[in-house]
Amino acid sequence: MKKNTDSEMDQRLGYKFLVPDPKAGVFYRPLHFQYVSYSNFILHRLHEILTVKRPLLSFKNNTERIMIEISNVKVTPPDYSPIIASIKGKSYDALATFTVNIFKEVMTKEGISITKISSYEGKDSHLIKIPLLIGYGNKNPLDTAKYLVPNVIGGVFINKQSVEKVGINLVEKITTWPKFRVVKPNSFTFSFSSVSPPNVLPTRYRHYKISLDISQLEALNISSTKTFITVNIVLLSQYLSRVSLEFIRRSLSYDMPPEVVYLVNAIIDSAKRITESITDFNIDTYINDLVEAEHIKQKSQLTINEFKYEMLHNFLPHMNYTPDQLKGFYMISLLRKFLYCIYHTSRYPDRDSMVCHRILTYGKYFETLAHDELENYIGNIRNDIMNNHKNRGTYAVNIHVLTTPGLNHAFSSLLSGKFKKSDGSYRTHPHYSWMQNISIPRSVGFYPDQVKISKMFSVRKYHPSQYLYFCSSDVPERGPQVGLVSQLSVLSSITNILTSEYLDLEKKICEYIRSYYKDDISYFETGFPITIENALVASLNPNMICDFVTDFRRRKRMGFFGNLEVGITLVRDHMNEIRINIGAGRLVRPFLVVDNGELMMDVCPELESRLDDMTFSDIQKEFPHVIEMVDIEQFTFSNVCESVQKFRMMSKDERKQYDLCDFPAEFRDGYVASSLVGINHNSGPRAILGCAQAKQAISCLSSDIRNKIDNGIHLMYPERPIVISKALETSKIAANCFGQHVTIALMSYKGINQEDGIIIKKQFIQRGGLDIVTAKKHQVEIPLENFNNKERDRSNAYSKLESNGLVRLNAFLESGDAMARNISSRTLEDDFARDNQISFDVSEKYTDMYKSRVERVQVELTDKVKVRVLTMKERRPILGDKFTTRTSQKGTVAYVADETELPYDENGITPDVIINSTSIFSRKTISMLIEVILTAAYSAKPYNNKGENRPVCFPSSNETSIDTYMQFAKQCYEHSNPKLSDEELSDKIFCEKILYDPETDKPYASKVFFGPIYYLRLRHLTQDKATVRCRGKKTKLIRQANEGRKRGGGIKFGEMERDCLIAHGAANTITEVLKDSEEDYQDVYVCENCGDIAAQIKGINTCLRCSKLNLSPLLTKIDTTHVSKVFLTQMNARGVKVKLDFERRPPSFYKPLDKVDLKPSFLV
């Protein structure tokens, strides 16, 4: 019994992470990291970026400077709620204002004199409009007092015209580990990026590359385009660190394999040859000469001292305030990795590994754009001052330049899907699924152009570094995004940190490191470098590394550093480094802690009794050593046990090798995969297809469907699923519903429900079963004069319009009806005409195949009349509509049957849906049967022993055997009816019933699987996809059907099609289209005697059957499809003879000529 308790304990701890944690400010866990990211930007980071004081121009040896100062940054929230924004048809934005002062500083003997040039106090209501992220319950980070709407999970932006926008998270291009590349045999590069800390603004980027060619070891250089000299890295390290070449040799050779030591010796010897080739070599003189040569090459206007200071001071911006000696030791540690990677590439994190990447969240998007646009804004001011001084001789700035920062356009482009000239960051949220609001903000994708340029084809595979942090099921199955977009698992999140918190945390960690004995943290020759965000701070005694890391992790969990998401990674395997990561954009998730071979949750006896009353933050405070937040880099270089069960089966010595233990399998799925049931009981592809279909399921009504003029599909009578997982419940996907419970029967019905075809009951449809309502936006722009023109002849298209020229509310629009008046008029140049004014209707018509009711009409009057109309339509299931279960058993309505046509059980109950029974075996979806069994068992006992309603927990991925669920169903039926016989009980457990034929009223020979299941309706609707028609609009030029389904278009028969029919004949053309393609065409030889296909032996076609009989038949060449040839071969292999016979008739071109009589006609 203890084993079961322990296995439940890790599951309960995992559930604690998923539920809200108000004490820690977590009200909605799935999107909490996005809320924090955006809140950090708009409350803190925006002020840091916009608050600027820096020189624009300098003159006279820097004694005169033009300065710019931006201050008084204020961010004001909107006065209305998101629902009011929807009613008004406006965006939901915050207003940012600031004050700009431009002045001239002149250095005099008395001091600095300041002369004002220009200023602007930004009070414009449109200066900077920042789209506000709507959080859980319609909250926003600027005004947390907004009322809560429980079913609104947020995570979206409301763009102009009240269109919701939502986007994925992009993988940052800059890597935290240097990128190793084999250029050609024996030629390698090691490139890395250096980015200044978040407190340094504007952010400085430097990109460096170390090159090595085995044939030219003297050219082991480090370089950077226009920002650094090209120099031998060994000599640069010596220059910065002030150590000897022998010191560098010992440092590079320490704890390295023999082959690497040999290469190190060769490299140091080559560096010595450089020094020996120069008379009286001095390292300072050598570097100064290279700097002077670079100064001349770049034709810099700076003095040589300023140029040298700029180049060397800004070298490695991420170590900006670090002494040069530590920079030199950092270069030595990089060189160690480079040389080791040459021989052991597979042990080094490759460029596709998520260990090397940070992730851009919503706040980071806006932060990057704000930083870039501010630099453009300041650059425009600088250019305007220079132009005015050049043309007018005065230092002045045009007011238009001051009042147009450019951020509005950048933010608008961001919400339109363009982030720094690359697509894929944002997309419009489709309103048919609640899961899209969760799945898209939790998706992580690569830049599309990054994949094309860098040729990162291997990234499309499931990378080992994604294990546990990403869902392996919820990935695109087809299209250009395959392998480029991944879904976070339910326990994963992305870190965020304020600049002030970053600096405090860095200070505390440095103080902790320096609390060690000085000699123990100064092992720069043979020690383990300690880096904080890649910045070297110390080098630890190798004998102390295990104690240091263990103590650091314990202090971190106890809150010693004030941040529980710090990552500490011990990199062994000869690379020898301790990496401490504290920055934003890291993937983190909780793990169970293993300390000295003991699972720490076992040594806390009070935890189990107190767990129900505690939140996740309470566990971290009161039991700090039970759970640890681990980033993906620390996880990759740690020993992690797969499950608690496997950990307990190990010996004590084996347990001591592990650092962490994982939670059960259900926590490795994403939130979309968690909406499925028992995917580990099905075949693998069903999980991927199930996730794609679950995101296409139509869900319940949104809170402001009648206010928001936007496209949407909504389920009319949703039901909460009975069989759920904990993630489905805590994410509120279950509460917001995305389907209905229906009664299904697995059987064949008159041969109609073949393949994906399903039979659906007519009365079920009439009662509102899986009924939906479609909201559709229609938008037209009409010239003002056209809108004011009156129609001369009454048009049927204007029958639904009122006198004001707009469509009536509650009018039912049909195909061809106009939504607003649009009459174009023209004057004829005819003096004899009585009325030279002609007018004609150019209005846009309603084109859908179904009638819709007008719900709302909005009009904006500018230079044009912009009319937006919202139409609503209730749409019941019809032939061709698609449905699915949560196990990816997709079905298409093949027949709508009356209740009298369907089989019934002993109680007269008929199934709502009949599904082809063979689909279970072909698709191997055993969990669909389990879901029906559990749902039926719930109906027998819907309450627990305390009288509380309890849904059935059936996680998407679980380690529970099927027998356990059968036992659960057995107990439910025995509780409600203990007198059942064994056969009756077995039939109820396995949902087997005797059904009766509706035509004969006789029972079927075998029992039928019959029970309830949660059924989903997909957004693929027949009437939205129908495009082909015989009658309709025609183009004026060619008098054929126009193109496009929205315009009522059809198939056009063009000139090329006409010419083919005329020249080739209709029959031959159809044959070519259907058969004679390059991929399908095949020539075969057929024996005219026996009808077999001839075999080719040594290049000679032979009929095997006739050759054995010593016959010499005639072989005739025919053209056929490859599929036909394979079919005949397969049939022959199964003993079925298919004879190809030829029609015997005289040839049409070689028949005997008719006799011609040449006698004169009068003699005949």
Curated annotation (Swiss-Prot):
InterPro entries with a match to the protein in the record: DNA-dir_RNA_pol_su2 (IPR015712), DNA-dir_RNAP_su2_dom (IPR007120), DNA-dir_RNAP_su2_hyb_sf (IPR037033), RNA_pol_132_poxvirus (IPR024390), RNA_pol_bsu_CS (IPR007121), RNA_pol_Rpb2_3 (IPR007645), RNA_pol_Rpb2_5 (IPR007647), RNA_pol_Rpb2_7 (IPR007641)
Catalytic reaction annotation: RNA(n) + a ribonucleoside 5'-triphosphate = RNA(n+1) + diphosphate
GO biological process, one term: DNA-templated transcription
Gene Ontology CC, one term: virion component
Enzyme Commission number(s): 2.7.7.6
Entry's localization field: Virion
Primary location: virion
Family: Belongs to the RNA polymerase beta chain family.
Record PANTHER family: DNA-DIRECTED RNA POLYMERASE I SUBUNIT 2
Subunit-level organization: The DNA-dependent RNA polymerase used for intermediate and late genes expression consists of eight subunits 147 kDa, 133 kDa, 35 kDa, 30 kDa, 22 kDa, 19 kDa, 18 kDa and 7 kDa totalling more than 500 kDa in mass. The same holoenzyme, with the addition of the transcription-specificity factor RAP94, is used for early gene expression.
Name the UniProt record assigns to this protein: DNA-directed RNA polymerase 133 kDa polypeptide
Species the sequence originates in: Vaccinia virus (strain Western Reserve)
Phylogenetic lineage: Viruses, Varidnaviria, Bamfordvirae, Nucleocytoviricota, Pokkesviricetes
UniProt gene name: OPG151
